[in-house]
């Protein structure tokens, strides 16, 4: 890709050089015609025409310079964006803002963490304690089956209840730290 940019830059410089040479050749041809001997050189109209010509030449040269400068700046910009894989110039890195989605995601994560801390604190204070069914009734529920011999959805419900009870007991008996 660097070679493409390099070739493009060379092409721009060659085209610019050929334009300058053709303009210089045209100016030299117009200067090579001798002025007629009968025209007075001190004529004010002639001086005004020469002045306008020199101003036009300066303006033309200046605009050519600005065009070449813009072309160089463009090629430099292309090369810089290629060097920076993320297409962000180094001077803009400091001012890069988070996207709204990223900000929303960060806030959501923070709020979820806060909610988890509050829930665990609520459980630790004892407000979350409930009376669970005895182990005997749970065993009886495990033995029930459908008529076809497969476990029912109640089995999943019972297992979920057991897991929830074990988790809450673990939370109540485990010392909570502020690392959450």
Swiss-Prot record:
Which keywords are on file for this protein? Amidation, Cleavage on pair of basic residues, Hormone, Phosphoprotein, Secreted, Signal
List, alphabetically, the GO terms of the cellular component aspect.
cytoplasm; extracellular space; plasma membrane
Question: What are the subcellular locations of this protein?
Answer: Secreted
Gene Ontology MF terms: glucagon receptor binding; hormone activity; identical protein binding
User: PROSITE patterns, alphabetically?
Assistant: GLUCAGON
Q: Which InterPro entries match?
A: Glucagon, Glucagon_GIP_secretin_VIP
Q: Which GO terms describe its biological process?
A: adenylate cyclase-activating G protein-coupled receptor signaling pathway; adenylate cyclase-modulating G protein-coupled receptor signaling pathway; cellular response to glucagon stimulus; gluconeogenesis; glucose homeostasis; negative regulation of apoptotic process; negative regulation of execution phase of apoptosis; positive regulation of calcium ion import
Query: Where expressed (tissues)?
Result: Glucagon is secreted in the A cells of the islets of Langerhans. GLP-1, GLP-2, oxyntomodulin and glicentin are secreted from enteroendocrine cells throughout the gastrointestinal tract. GLP-1 and GLP-2 are also secreted in selected neurons in the brain.
Miscellaneous note of the record: GLP-2 does not have cleavage on a pair of basic residues at C-terminus as in other mammals.
- Protein name (Swiss-Prot/TrEMBL): Pro-glucagon
């Amino acid at each position: 890709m660097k070679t493409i940019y390099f070739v493009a830059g060379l092409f721009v410089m060659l085209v610019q050089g050929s334009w300058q040479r053709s303009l210089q050749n045209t100016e030299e041809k117009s200067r090579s015609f001798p002025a007629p001997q009968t025209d007075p050189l001190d004529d004010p109209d002639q001086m005004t025409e020469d002045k306008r010509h020199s101003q036009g030449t300066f303006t033309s040269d200046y605009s050519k310079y600005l065009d070449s400068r813009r072309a160089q700046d463009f090629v430099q910009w292309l090369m810089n964006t290629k060097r920076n894989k993320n297409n962000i110039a180094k001077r803009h890195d400091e001012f890069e803002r988070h996207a709204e989605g990223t900000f929303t995601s960060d806030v959501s994560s923070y709020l979820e963490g806060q909610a988890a801390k509050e829930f665990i604190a609520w459980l630790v204070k004892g407000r979350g304690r409930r009376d669970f069914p005895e182990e005997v009734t749970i065993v009886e529920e495990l033995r029930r089956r459908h008529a076809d011999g497969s476990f029912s959805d109640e089995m999943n419900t019972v297992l979920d209840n057991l897991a929830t009870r074990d988790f809450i007991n673990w939370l109540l008996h485990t010392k909570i730290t502020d690392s959450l």
